[in-house]
């Protein structure tokens, strides 16, 4: 390790040049990495809803089908607009009644199902826009943007592709502000806690390298979710800032003992490497636990963040020393006193009253622990988006004018007779909440020769060996009523055709609900188990990992219980990921406190004195880390219009503060009270035989 440290210091200029040059391919990779805005695409591919969605995309080209509600528009103007939309690249077809019948034919002559489907309230009709790509492809995004420009007044464009296009536009516009808020918040905390006005900027420069490298290497993942992209920089900034602080503090200590800055840095690298490597393992393990999710969004976020932490460690050890040595004289020139308190009075209070502190905390935990399970969770992804987005407005308009809050796409084998399909459609119409049912047979009627229908229509309703039935419902996706509706549809379809499939937003969100409940349990189990094992190996203890993880889990329970008391609801993904993020990111505080407590006990101090000293000396580091993590995420929560991101960041920022308070108040008291148990269940906890017992 000493040889490696010496090589890093000796070749610091070469390392800095190489690091800067590596930013170029990393930046190219970051720009070239596709971003996925469709959370439902992360569902397991073997689910019926996903299999059906793939068939809609490959055989029917309906996966990215969107609908335009047109109110009060003359037929000739509507046909002219339809023709313009047909000319847009990637638009396969814009379907309206004129594709089947002469527009002069009175609507009263149409079958009742067709009338109900094509004409709604407010003198409205509907255009079905069929796009060639998937709902998240770049071609689809461009086509949606062009169609928006063509639409006249009183036209409302709705559908998943439109909403995803709006989401992309919103997130890409806000993302630079996320980073600026995170950087600004971190700088403010660092100005207060560090001893030089230049050091915060130096840290930000040092963190630029792992951030860009992390985003650049995402290209090897194929694509990343917009949630990951939005959170990764902010989380990486908040989580890995500690490593830079540890290195600088150790370097300042070594400078007082060594003959040269180079020697001081070599010693600092050696001592920092072991401490931050062990510390980062718990954080990496916490993020990798997200890979246990069936919803592969977890693996997406977990891998990117674990990779970011690992790169943060490497860059702290290899690149940051070069920057510190290069700017050392300016750092010294602009020194100032730190404004972060040591919490001396608090340390004496906690060490004098450990039992009351723990009792009060346990009593406080009871209501929050009960409230945690009662916090309202919602699964309607679009409810987490601004409701004034054009795609949301257009989709809601379908519900207002046509009763289409949710579309169900039902696929059955083409071998089913017209009579069987008709019977199935009649049964579907009786399902609670279903407003319209349209199939080939409801359009043509019995005995009609399908060869007379245009290819454009036939390709929509029958293709790839399957017939398509479209059922519209008035319930919103993710609701209990909608989930019950999907169950009933699946039952009816399977009775008519054991190979039949029900897909669409409603079916996929129902699968999401079921998977999310399982993912929540799996992620918590894996993250807790991984962190327990790492801490147990680090301390060679059975009791210490339980105490440390219990402290953070208690903080998580309080964090998750607060929404119940403030009458707030959480998006499902926030409830899944917050536990592992808060555990992985803040368990380091407890490790730092426990390590210092052990050092004080080894120095022959009593448990009371050791707890007091540990709290006093660790308070500044924990305050700096906790407030930095809070500042990095709170800014995003304050400005984001995407409720999904706002909720996650608010939980993380609040969790950082709660974990910080628990570690500063409760953990030292717990270490004091359980000192005897820790000594008996930890291998060589106290090597010094004369360590005080009282």
Where are each of the predicted segments found?
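Membrane-embedded transmembrane helical bundles of large multi-pass transporters/channels
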Residues: 1-37, 41, 91, 112, ...
